[in-house]
């Protein structure tokens, strides 16, 4: 190194268990034994400690699990480790996910960056802050542009992900100008190579080709991207670290462009597959920019150059994935043509460590994505469910379903309102997902809750929120079985209109204390991005002897109110809840079969299939109110969101016939 070269002493690398940053960290550890490297990573779904295996034995390496959004932790690390250089890679990066969870991108990419910058300002010891951004902040490049975006080009982001990265850049620039922080920004194009989580196209296509599955291309495949091999990118950051000028921006890219269709064809050729039969064109994404193109001259003037050609880089990448097929565990959710929010990798434990598996080097993982009808999806051995509600109806059925599907599960021993016991469960069981099927509905019915309000609050509100928060702290998805009995027909959703209540609608039924608590906790759970809320209504199963079964209930009543309602056939929808967990789906879902069925229609089916001599009589809602303590919810739920995700789901009447009445037919 010459006299003008910057030489750091103690480097903090954020997000270093992720793809690009792990290659950078491993390279610096390998090439500079006199540098102390501290890496900080919260270990989310696309990062893994195994990515840093080459560095763990080095005396100048230290790993810290934590979130850049924790200002206390960041300040503590800067001071105690005497950090003089930060290489900030940590970010949410998958564009598709940013459309369904943009607030999480804002939290990670903007707020997290702000925390780091403020810590740098307060400690006053940072000599270099290298902020890693993306070429997507420039926006879409004109198709006929002969010159790529240079570092002074206007920022015109087109999606939530790139908008958060551009926002973070503005903060970096402001802290550089306002407080004199020694900042450098990089903007990179697409990177590929070993260790990359298969939400990105190249590893996704390789894994699909390995398992003989079609390669899904959005639109016509004419979109153009530039690709750099990961080791070339790691070298670029090595150059920027030592030779980059404070206050400058550097594009990390290549002028060699490739159409998506050509990338898919090249991967097919590597596997000896016919591209025409192996490539499947699927519906395009509405936010799929046509082209990103960078000018790469500024970085080259520092002495960097691309070393790995496309053919060699792709071959190295393919070889790595075929030799490490289980690196990421169950990635079936990521391999879907249109994945929603991606799952936690199967090998991830709640404490951030990874399960070690003995996999021979020539093993090829077969990845399967099966619809809920088959009740089988992905690598079941990598899943482990923690279920609360062992003694309840839904909890018991979930356990039986896991046994049937070969999924490892355990019931939680802790009580929902006891935080310490929940933490102990997660530490000992180390689940990949948590299912909450616990709750107080009242025995024999919701009238019980009217005289047991403290107990109902303790479990339905305080307990559920406690479990959600413990899961959040451990980066776990919580599948929460809730209720749709928080709505009632009204002027905008009249009975018989076919207009159902949607997921975003706010509760309008508070006739029972049970419903009040469920409405309250649902509203609060909206603030937890790790929760999937399933609104169950009047649950039904093929077990007609179970007193919790809605059909069993009304068949034992002397009189029933004949009114149409949305309902949940558990035999069909409980397997869907497991599939939703595998797909890492979040937010609120109306968990009912499409359509409505009246109580008289159900009892007519019961008479035709089960008990020919069965008789019943009706009474009005007003007459019913005289013999019950709390009012009952009647409504229609809009099932379009769930139906779009699972188009094979049957309507309520079809599902009743297939799963309940046909199997129990006695006449």
Swiss-Prot record:
<dbReference type="Pfam" id="PF04321">
    <property type="entry name" value="RmlD_sub_bind"/>
</dbReference>
<keyword id="KW-0456">Lyase</keyword>
<dbReference type="GO" id="GO:0010214">
    <property type="term" value="P:seed coat development"/>
</dbReference>
<keyword id="KW-0521">NADP</keyword>
<dbReference type="GO" id="GO:0010253">
    <property type="term" value="P:UDP-rhamnose biosynthetic process"/>
</dbReference>
<dbReference type="GO" id="GO:0008460">
    <property type="term" value="F:dTDP-glucose 4,6-dehydratase activity"/>
</dbReference>
<dbReference type="GO" id="GO:0010490">
    <property type="term" value="F:UDP-4-keto-rhamnose-4-keto-reductase activity"/>
</dbReference>
<dbReference type="InterPro" id="IPR029903">
    <property type="entry name" value="RmlD-like-bd"/>
</dbReference>
<keyword id="KW-0413">Isomerase</keyword>
<feature type="active site" description="Proton acceptor">
    <location>
        <position position="161"/>
    </location>
</feature>
<comment type="similarity">
    <text>In the N-terminal section; belongs to the NAD(P)-dependent epimerase/dehydratase family. dTDP-glucose dehydratase subfamily.</text>
</comment>
<keyword id="KW-0511">Multifunctional enzyme</keyword>
<feature type="binding site">
    <location>
        <begin position="15"/>
        <end position="21"/>
    </location>
    <ligand>
        <name>NAD(+)</name>
    </ligand>
</feature>
<dbReference type="GO" id="GO:0010192">
    <property type="term" value="P:mucilage biosynthetic process"/>
</dbReference>
<keyword id="KW-0520">NAD</keyword>
<protein>
    <recommendedName>
        <fullName>Trifunctional UDP-glucose 4,6-dehydratase/UDP-4-keto-6-deoxy-D-glucose 3,5-epimerase/UDP-4-keto-L-rhamnose-reductase RHM2</fullName>
        <ecNumber>4.2.1.76</ecNumber>
        <ecNumber>1.1.1.-</ecNumber>
        <ecNumber>5.1.3.-</ecNumber>
    </recommendedName>
</protein>
<feature type="active site" description="Proton donor">
    <location>
        <position position="135"/>
    </location>
</feature>
<feature type="binding site">
    <location>
        <position position="134"/>
    </location>
    <ligand>
        <name>substrate</name>
    </ligand>
</feature>
<dbReference type="Pfam" id="PF16363">
    <property type="entry name" value="GDP_Man_Dehyd"/>
</dbReference>
<comment type="pathway">
    <text>Carbohydrate biosynthesis.</text>
</comment>
<dbReference type="InterPro" id="IPR016040">
    <property type="entry name" value="NAD(P)-bd_dom"/>
</dbReference>
<feature type="binding site">
    <location>
        <begin position="389"/>
        <end position="395"/>
    </location>
    <ligand>
        <name>NADP(+)</name>
    </ligand>
</feature>
<dbReference type="InterPro" id="IPR036291">
    <property type="entry name" value="NAD(P)-bd_dom_sf"/>
</dbReference>
<dbReference type="GO" id="GO:0050377">
    <property type="term" value="F:UDP-glucose 4,6-dehydratase activity"/>
</dbReference>
<dbReference type="GO" id="GO:0010280">
    <property type="term" value="F:UDP-L-rhamnose synthase activity"/>
</dbReference>
<dbReference type="GO" id="GO:0005634">
    <property type="term" value="C:nucleus"/>
</dbReference>
<keyword id="KW-0560">Oxidoreductase</keyword>
<comment type="function">
    <text>Trifunctional enzyme involved in UDP-beta-L-rhamnose biosynthesis, a precursor of the primary cell wall components rhamnogalacturonan I (RG-I) and rhamnogalacturonan II (RG-II). Catalyzes the dehydration of UDP-glucose to form UDP-4-dehydro-6-deoxy-D-glucose followed by the epimerization of the C3' and C5' positions of UDP-4-dehydro-6-deoxy-D-glucose to form UDP-4-keto-beta-L-rhamnose and the reduction of UDP-4-keto-beta-L-rhamnose to yield UDP-beta-L-rhamnose. Required for the normal seed coat epidermal development.</text>
</comment>
<comment type="similarity">
    <text>In the C-terminal section; belongs to the dTDP-4-dehydrorhamnose reductase family.</text>
</comment>
<feature type="active site" description="Proton acceptor">
    <location>
        <position position="136"/>
    </location>
</feature>
<dbReference type="InterPro" id="IPR005888">
    <property type="entry name" value="dTDP_Gluc_deHydtase"/>
</dbReference>
<dbReference type="GO" id="GO:0010489">
    <property type="term" value="F:UDP-4-keto-6-deoxy-glucose-3,5-epimerase activity"/>
</dbReference>
């Amino acid at each position: 190194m010459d006299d003008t070269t910057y030489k750091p002493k103690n480097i903090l690398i954020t997000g270093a268990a992720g793809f690009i940053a792990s290659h950078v960290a491993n390279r610096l550890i390998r090439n500079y034994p006199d540098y102390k490297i501290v890496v900080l990573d919260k270990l989310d779904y696309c990062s893994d400690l195994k990515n840093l295996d080459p560095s763990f034995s080095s005396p100048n390496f230290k790993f810290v699990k934590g979130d850049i959004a924790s200002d206390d932790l960041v300040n503590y690390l800067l001071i105690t480790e005497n950090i003089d250089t930060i290489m900030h890679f940590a970010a949410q990066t998958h564009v598709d996910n940013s459309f369904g969870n943009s607030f999480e991108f804002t939290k990670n990419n903007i707020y997290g960056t702000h925390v780091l910058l403020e810590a740098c300002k307060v400690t006053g010891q940072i000599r270099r802050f290298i902020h890693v951004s993306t070429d997507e902040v420039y926006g879409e490049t004109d198709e006929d542009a002969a010159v790529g975006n240079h570092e002074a080009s206007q920022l015109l982001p087109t999606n939530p992900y790139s908008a958060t990265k551009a926002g973070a850049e503005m903060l970096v620039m402001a802290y550089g100008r306002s407080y004199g922080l020694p900042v450098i920004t990089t903007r990179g194009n697409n990177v590929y190579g070993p260790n990359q989580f298969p939400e990105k196209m190249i590893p996704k296509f390789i894994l699909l080709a390995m398992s003989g599955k079609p390669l899904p291309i959005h639109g016509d495949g004419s979109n153009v991207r530039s690709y750099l091999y990961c080791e070339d990118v790691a070298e670029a950051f090595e150059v920027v670290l030592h030779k980059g000028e404070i206050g400058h921006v550097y594009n990390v890219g290549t002028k060699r462009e490739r159409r998506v269709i050509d990338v898919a064809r090249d991967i097919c050729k590597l596997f000896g597959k016919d591209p025409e039969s192996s490539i499947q064109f699927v519906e395009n994404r509405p936010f799929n920019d046509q082209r990103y193109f960078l000018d790469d001259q500024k970085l080259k003037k520092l002495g960097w150059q691309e070393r790995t050609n496309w053919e060699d880089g792709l071959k190295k990448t393919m070889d790595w994935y075929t030799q490490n097929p289980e690196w990421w565990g169950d990635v079936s959710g990521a391999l879907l043509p249109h994945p929603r929010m991606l799952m936690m990798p199967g090998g991830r434990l709640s404490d951030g460590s990874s399960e070690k598996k003995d996999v021979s080097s020539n093993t090829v993982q077969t990845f399967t994505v099966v619809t809920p009808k088959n009740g089988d999806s992905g690598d079941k051995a990598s899943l482990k469910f923690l279920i609360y509600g062992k003694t309840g109806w839904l909890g018991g059925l979930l356990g039986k379903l896991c046994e049937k599907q070969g999924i490892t599960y355990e019931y939680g021993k802790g009580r929902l309102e006891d935080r310490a016991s929940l933490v102990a469960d997660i530490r000992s069981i180390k689940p990949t997902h948590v299912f909450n099927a616990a709750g107080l509905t009242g025995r024999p019915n919701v009238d019980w809750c009217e005289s047991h309000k403290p107990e109902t609050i303790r479990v339905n509100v305080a307990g559920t929120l406690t479990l959600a928060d413990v899961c959040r702290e451990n980066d776990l998805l919580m599948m929460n079985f809730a209720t749709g009995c928080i709505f009632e027909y009204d002027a905008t959703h009249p009975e018989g209109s076919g207009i159902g209540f949607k997921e975003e609608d706010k509760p309008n039924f508070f006739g029972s204390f049970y419903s009040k608590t469920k409405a309250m906790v649902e509203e609060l759970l909206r603030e937890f991005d790790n929760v999937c809320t399933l609104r169950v209504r009047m649950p039904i199963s093929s077990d007609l002897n179970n007193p919790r079964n809605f059909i069993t209930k009304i068949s034992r009543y002397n009189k029933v109110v004949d009114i149409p309602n949305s309902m949940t056939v558990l035999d069909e929808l409980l397997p869907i809840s497991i599939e939703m967990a595998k797909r890492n789906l979040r937010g609120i879902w109306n968990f009912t079969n499409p359509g409505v069925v009246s109580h008289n229609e159900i009892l007519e089916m019961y008479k035709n299939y089960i008990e020919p001599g069965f008789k019943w009589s009706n009474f009005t809602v007003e007459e019913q109110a005289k013999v019950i303590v709390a009012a009952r919810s009647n409504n229609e739920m809009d099932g379009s969101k769930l139906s779009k995700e699972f188009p094979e789901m049957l309507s309520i009447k079809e599902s009743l016939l297939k799963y309940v009445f046909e199997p129990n037919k006695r006449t």
